[in-house]
């Protein structure tokens, strides 16, 4: 029973998959900015938009060991492009860890499946 409660919900998985794609898009954009102008500061608009994605990922991963390493970007002391890439890199690593923990190959599901509270034995995805 306790193990099932620590599994993500089906809603968490759906949201996670959407946020994972958004995170990759942000990473690719910020990587380009960091290559061209690593020390240039982000503006408040970018920080707010990036934090909107990061905060939702952080919420899904609040019970994971990686949570303590997931910081939001500081809106007051605007981070540089290279600082942003470091933070996003930590989220990307946490996403890989999360996926490897709860997503697996299942013969029964004939493909990849998620362990969730509603489907502790796995749900095809």
Give residue ranges: language-model regions.
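Short terminal alpha-helical segments
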Residues: 1-43
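Acidic-enriched, low-complexity/disordered segments with a strong bias for Aspartate over Glutamate
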Residues: 10-12, 39, 67, 71-76, ...
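Generic structural concept
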Residues: 10-13, 17-27, 47-54, 58, ...
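Amphipathic alpha-helical interaction modules
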Residues: 28-72
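Amphipathic alpha-helical binding modules
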Residues: 76-125
